[in-house]
Amino acid sequence: MAVLASAAAVLTIAGGAGAAAAPTTLTASLSGEAEPEGGQGSGTARLTLDPATGRVCFNIRLRGVGTTAAGHIHRGAEGVAGPVVIALYGEPTRRPRGCVQDQPAAAIRQILRRPGRFYVNVHTAAHPDGAARGQLER
């Protein structure tokens, strides 16, 4: 009986560890109003983060922004500017999407643990400090 209980405990722990490392999708509603000197842009960001592989994939849809220059995930509560945690892209594009590799697992786990403490920020030439921003959520 003790052997069965131990085996069940091992399976439960292993299953829980695997679930914690699974890719997770987060979203953000982006708005220029969330930036101190942002534009009139709005849109959505959908990110899939995988702490096991260090891969972060993103698909950002924007309206009223034009060509973007860069996109990042920053640490910071709503209305608070914070440091970049993960750089998503840094080349001009009208349709930001793709994946970045080799991101720190610890940073990804922090984002997944408390997504509301992080935000997606999209930059343009006209708004280098941020054209649109949105807090991450499940």
Predicted regions mapped to residue ranges:
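Metal-centered catalytic cores of metalloenzymes
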Residues: 2-71, 75-138
